[in-house]
From Swiss-Prot:
Belongs to the Mediator complex subunit 16 family. GO terms for cellular component: mediator complex. Component of the Mediator complex, a coactivator involved in the regulated transcription of nearly all RNA polymerase II-dependent genes. Mediator functions as a bridge to convey information from gene-specific regulatory proteins to the basal RNA polymerase II transcription machinery. Mediator is recruited to promoters by direct interactions with regulatory proteins and serves as a scaffold for the assembly of a functional preinitiation complex with RNA polymerase II and the general transcription factors. It is found in: Nucleus. It comes from Emericella nidulans (strain FGSC A4 / ATCC 38163 / CBS 112.46 / NRRL 194 / M139). It holds the Pfam family Med16_C. This is Mediator of RNA polymerase II transcription subunit 16. InterPro entries: Mediator_Med16, Mediator_Med16_C, Mediator_Med16_N, WD40_repeat_dom_sf. Component of the Mediator complex. The keyword Zinc-finger does not apply. GO terms for biological process: positive regulation of DNA-templated transcription. Keywords: Activator, Nucleus, Transcription, Transcription regulation. The keyword Nucleus applies.
Length: 930
């Protein structure tokens, strides 16, 4: 007998219309997106820690594979071929599968600086990884095998302890008399810190256990645990936990299986509270050991979903009495609005709980007005407990005692939506609360007032990108997503585990055929504010750079750069205060983004606006090497105090500095000859100068680059003078000897070049004085030289003096023929055939300034994948690695681990362990070892 369904009989033929019984059954098969949403909501309902993709402040994007067994990393990078920015290919962290022994990976969490990654699996086991040298080189520092395999240990809440460092921040930008004024302040760190400045991770487990994983100064990890106090056994089974650091300690909110929210305040005491590494070397100090002090604030929060008191006079007992049972908590957060002052004080935190109806939920009867998600908020407040007046009549032996303050939660108005909320994120350094929905739409709110950012309400005040009118266009939805460091990009995972990049957009004042200058200006100011916040917090700003390149015109980019120099208070006039130039924290950042804006590919010459900052960045690099070399060789004892690797670095940069100096002289000689025909006609001279584009001329006229040239000359003299007294042997003698021979063979002596710089100083000074420009007026033309790469009118007399008097007077002290015959193509600044050929056939190590092997075919010429995959960390001798900068696409080869302590210290001092001289992060060529 055949089965009844084999005859194709429809259910409706048996029971009538599909809607006649109002069973609430779906009329069609759920789509893949519906299934994905249902699965995502289930994940969020069951456990609070289910972040499968995370973007670190260093720029590394980590994501869990679709089968939950692997972690992949990727990042933003600039393409060598055309200078366009996009996501890199994935690099798998194969060691993760081994570390977690096949357990399903469920959660990712980066620390505040973005250098350490915590990976949690379904059994609550946690492994930790660090980024030592490159964005795609992630090494394990803590094994998950240390943790027990226990379902009750599953992580429901996780937070890295803050790092003890104060950073520069910016509160807002306000337009004053037609110009934007930025509000900088130094933000002090808040909360508990590891005394040894090591990593510390606080976790809350499903069984109500709080544990702190912390790293000792020797690199080993330890942990302490304590149980959260609960009112009943059912309260011990937690589903979600939220943690935030405040001035009074760590605030913890938990949600239990019996649907209660409890609040705790936790303090961590370290013994000793201070850590001095020098005392540890003497064996007189123990490692810091933490301990918990836990206070249960005894706040249990009942809730009605949605809130029954939204409308005044409404009977709470009659409004949707059944709806609370339909909702499940899907996320729990504690929001701490951003501080706007240097003291670190912040407004009171508030708790955010998102409740959603499952997609498969069956309603008792049609209720179209029931929202899919409800955002419930409680304000955390402190009030004094008051006693009944009768207690005043009771005599007390102890006199009037102080009444302890009481912590209360005041429920605020709910926020409802017909769409499901899939994430709540505090972005833009705490200045924006972003709520993401299942249809890919994102709503932005002010964390202090919960006012929605729907556009520009006040065009004269800018606090964030979202407030200034930036928004995300609707795109195919990703159910797992993470914001970039500046929150102007989103990376998301779709149902198939594929990664997608979403980019913020803005009209920039062009709307409906009209132009609004105020909206354009606010957009530029908000981008400036975001970039400056990244600079102050030492955060990766490649996401901002992508926006600038893709969306801004050249004029708008110039406007942005002018705002950056003003916001960061960069005084471009370094005629007198030259010593401040070497340690200025923001000059490299401003130069780097300016150079990157004009980069159109590795094999194309930069335009003049990009070449000027790119040359100054490299001058700064060379100028910093010599004082660092002198500093680290002081007091070194032994038969060979000079490190061969360091001397090789000094040798390469010495050759580069000399050739760049000769390149400037060669161009000056050519310009002097070219302008000789108009030397007697000032008007013709001025017109010819307007049509002349010369990198060497701008480098000489700018006080910033001229100061770097002077520092280099000082270093070259010190290197040459120190050779006679240096005890050298082996490779050190070979390299140091070659340095001195290179200096001796130069067509121009160092003292002669310093004489040229002094002549330029005099010409520039007289030009400023003749025009009546004092110290307050000079930054203007100096900034025009740097940002616009144009010679301002006030400096035209200086150019005339340099070409007519300074250069001709020094011809006799230089070997003009040797300068003319020099090969400067390897410097990379020219657009002649020789420079073009060198760019396509060779690479130059951007740090060591030494040529790298020729390219073969279309490859990079940087070694095979097999050679890179060896990495050398597996043996103690180190291995040669090729790293490429994700921003400028330049290459550097290095030994890792470094062969000597001095070499490592120099690399660390110069800031080149993880980043290039331009500030871009390294990408390991060939990928990561297995």
């Amino acid at each position: 007998m055949p089965l009844i369904m084999e005859d194709g009989i429809n259910v409706d033929d048996l029971f009538g219309e599909s809607t006649s019984l109002e069973l609430g059954l779906p009329t069609s098969t759920p789509t893949a997106s519906t299934k994905g949403l249902a699965q995502r909501l289930d994940e969020m309902r069951l456990v609070g820690c289910c972040q499968k993709i995370a973007w670190s402040r260093l720029g590394c994007i980590a994501s869990i594979s679709q089968d939950s067994t692997r972690v992949n990393v990727r990042h933003l990078q600039c393409q060598q071929s055309d200078g366009k920015w996009l996501l890199s290919d994935e690099t798998p962290l194969n060691q993760v599968s081994e570390v977690h022994a096949g357990h399903a990976l469920v959660h990712l969490c980066w620390n505040d600086s973005g250098t350490e990654l915590a990976v949690a699996d379904s059994s609550g086991r946690v492994s930790i990884y660090s980024i030592p040298i490159a964005l795609n080189s992630v090494n394990v520092t803590r094994q998950a095998a240390f943790d027990p395999d226990d379902d009750g240990a599953q992580i429901v809440g996780m937070m890295w302890l803050s790092q003890y460092r104060s950073v520069h921040s910016f509160y807002q930008a306000a337009k004053v008399q037609g110009r934007w004024a930025y509000s900088p302040f130094r933000r002090r760190p808040i909360g508990t810190f590891h005394p040894a400045h090591k990593g510390a991770l606080l976790c809350i487990t499903r069984s109500g256990v709080m544990k702190l994983l912390y790293q000792n100064p020797d690199g080993r990890w330890a942990e302490i645990t304590t149980e959260l106090k609960n009112t009943s056994y059912s309260d011990r089974l937690l589903t979600h936990a939220a943690l935030v650091t405040t001035q009074a300690g760590i605030l913890v909110a938990t949600h239990s299986a019996c649907q209660r929210i409890s609040l705790y305040r936790v303090s961590i005491q370290w013994t000793p509270s201070q850590w001095d590494p020098t005392q540890q070397k003497q064996g007189s100090q123990q490692f810091p050991t933490p301990s918990f002090r836990l206070v249960h604030m005894k706040v249990e929060v009942p809730y009605n979903i949605p809130s029954s008191n939204r409308d005044a006079g409404e009977n709470p007992d009659e409004q949707l009495p059944f709806t609370s049972s339909l909702y499940c908590l899907t996320s729990l957060h504690i929001i701490l609005p951003a501080s706007d002052n240097s003291a670190g004080s912040t407004p009171n935190p508030w708790i955010v709980a998102v409740f959603s109806i499952p997609t498969h939920a069956i309603l008792p009867h049609p209720q179209p007005q029931i929202p899919a998600s409800v955002i419930v908020r409680w304000q955390l407040e402190t009030s004094l407990m008051t006693l009944h007046p009768r207690f005043d009549d009771v005599p007390s032996k102890k006199g009037n005692g102080q009444v302890k303050p009481k912590t209360v939660l005041r429920r605020l108005d709910d926020i409802t939506s017909g769409r499901h909320v899939i994430s709540v994120d505090q972005t833009e350094y705490g200045n924006v609360l972003a709520v993401s929905y299942d249809d890919s739409s994102i709503a932005f709110y002010d964390p202090k007032t919960m006012a929605a950012f729907d556009g520009i309400d006040d065009a004269n005040t800018v606090t964030s990108l979202a407030q200034a009118g930036f928004h995300y266009p609707l795109e195919p939805s990703a159910l797992h997503m993470s914001f970039s460091p500046s929150a102007c990009l989103i990376v998301g995972l779709d149902n198939d585990g594929q990664t997608h990049l979403r980019i913020m957009e803005h009209s920039y004042g062009a709307e409906n055929g009209h132009y609004d200058e105020n909206k354009y200006s606010a957009a530029i100011a908000s981008l400036t504010l975001a970039f400056c916040r990244g600079c102050g917090g030492e955060v990766n700003t490649d996401d901002i750079l992508l926006i600038l390149i893709r969306q801004l015109s050249p004029d708008a980019q110039t406007a942005f750069l002018n705002e950056v120099y003003r916001a960061l208070s960069i005084n471009c006039n370094f005629t007198t205060e030259q010593d401040k130039l070497m340690n200025h924290p923001y000059i490299p950042r401003a130069l780097s983004i300016q150079a990157a804006l004009g980069f159109k590919g590795k094999f194309r010459a930069r335009n003049i606006a990009s070449n000027v900052p790119w040359a100054i960045i490299q001058l700064r690099q060379a100028a910093m090497i010599y004082p660092s070399f002198f500093q680290y060789n002081k007091g070194v004892q032994g038969p060979e105090p000079h490190d061969p690797d360091v001397l090789r670095l000094v040798l390469g940069n010495t050759k580069w500095a000399l050739d760049f100096s000769l390149y400037i002289l060669n161009e000056l000689f050519d310009l002097a000859d070219d302008f000789e025909s108009v030397s007697s006609d000032q008007e013709a001279f001025n017109q010819k100068l307007k049509t002349t584009t010369s990198l060497p001329l701008i480098i000489l006229l700018s006080s910033m680059s001229r100061a770097f040239l002077r520092f280099i000359c000082r270093g070259l003299r010190g290197i040459h003078a120190g050779y006679a007294n240096a005890p050298l042997t082996g490779d050190s003698r070979v390299y140091y000897t070659e340095i001195c021979q290179t200096l001796d063979a130069s067509p121009v002596r160092t003292d002669v070049y310093e004489k040229l710089l002094a002549g330029v100083d005099s010409a520039v000074k007289h030009a400023y004085t003749g025009a009546g420009f004092g110290d307050n007026e000079r930054p203007g033309p100096e900034k025009e030289l740097l940002v616009s790469s144009r010679i301002p009118p006030v400096l035209v007399p200086a150019v005339s003096t340099i070409l007519r008097q300074t250069v001709p007077a020094m011809r006799g002290e230089m070997d003009r023929l040797a300068i003319f015959m020099g090969d400067y193509g390897w410097l990379g600044f020219g657009n002649d055939a020789r420079s073009e050929l060198y760019r396509r056939e060779r690479d130059v190590d951007i740090i060591k300034k030494t040529p790298i092997a020729s390219r073969s075919g279309k490859g990079s010429g940087l070694g095979s994948v097999e050679a890179v995959m060896g990495l050398g960390a597996r043996n103690g001798n180190g291995s040669q690695l090729s790293r490429r900068c994700v921003r400028c696409c330049e290459v550097s080869e290095a030994m890792y681990p470094p062969r000597s302590v001095l070499s490592f210290k120099m690399t660390l001092k110069l800031g080149h362990l993880r980043s290039c001289i331009c500030g871009g992060m390294w990408n390991l060529e060939g990928g990561l070892p297995g």
